[in-house]
Amino acid sequence: VIETLQKQEKVQLIITTHSPNLASKIKLGNLIICSGNNAFPMGKDYTKLKEDSYVFLEKFLDVTKSNLFFAKGVILVEGWAEEILIPSLAKAIGIDLTAKGVSVVNIGNVGFDHYSKIFLRKNVPFMDIPVAVVTDCDVREYELDGNEYERKDNIDSERKSKINEIESKSFENVKYFVAPHWTLEYCLNLSDTLKQEFQKIVKSIHTRGGWNSDFEKELARKLIIGKLEKTEIAYKLANYLDSLENIPLEESDTICYLKKAIEYAAGN
């Protein structure tokens, strides 16, 4: 009905809803998000979205992703592993994302700009909904040298430069949280808190390979050739986290970036 009415001329239709299903059927430019004491129109004159983003979002904003319009906080991720793991990690550090009204939205590999700029305004007032963007730094720490995968030398400056480049995209209420090493999985393997359980799970899923001789190198090889079962690993690690309470995550832990993203989106 909504889609039909939107095609008619000289008809003004006003709908108030908390339904992501209905919101996903309305043209993005016609939406108005009410937050606090302000109303934020989503039209082209108000947001920092480009024309192609409107076209893209009207095609790909499904019911699940439309949850972000009703959230008190948003965490944007680019893969199933993060989407599965973050709610369980949040619970393990004492934050209930559901109770806080935080939505974790998996945008896949389409780029964050399409989604994050929904929340960026051309003029004041700016939106007060915290948006945490969680992403990998994607600087490989191993490379193929002949027939062997070897650790790259002197990548600290390259990694730091890439992280700074990504974090510089933070603006207004949108903040980027970047994996300090390569990918989520690589950071899990370096984590003081979860390394042991992560390695146990990986070995239970990938029963073949040189895990016992050099786990890090085998992990790097799997990441490079795209053969790591990231989703299954995340499910099992999430189940493990669900059994924990108040786990310590120090600032130096390589997955602390996830904790910071959770805290930011939850308003902690």
Predicted regions and their residues:
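Acidic, divalent-metal-binding catalytic cores of TOPRIM
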Residues: 3, 8, 23-268
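Loop/turn-to-beta-strand initiation segments
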Residues: 9-14
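H-loop/switch region of ABC-family ATPase nucleotide-binding domains
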Residues: 16-18
